[in-house]
A protein has these predicted regions:
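Conserved short acidic donor-positioning loop in nucleotide-sugar-dependent glycosyltransferases
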Residues: 64
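Recognition helix of helix-turn-helix/homeodomain-like DNA-binding domains
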Residues: 26-42
Length: 65
């Protein structure tokens, strides 16, 4: 199993602020912050959307599994 980076680290590495990322994902910043604090809450559909916005494969981001 390869090492994974946190959801927040993935966002920062993509050069996005919390507000920028939430705008790209069309969700509220509070929801994104909640997911960053508890990535196990992110369902597979949103995992794919986040990985596309952050330009990282889903397998590289830690989603709590």
């Amino acid at each position: 199993m390869s090492p994974k980076i946190s959801l927040k680290a993935a966002r920062v590495n993509a050069g996005l602020t919390l507000l920028n990322a939430s705008a790209h994902l069309k969700i509220g910043k509070d929801l994104l912050l909640k997911w960053e604090k508890n990535p196990g809450l992110v369902n597979p559909i949103w995992q794919k959307k986040i990985s596309a916005v952050y330009n990282l494969p889903v397998d590289f981001i830690f989603f709590g599994q």
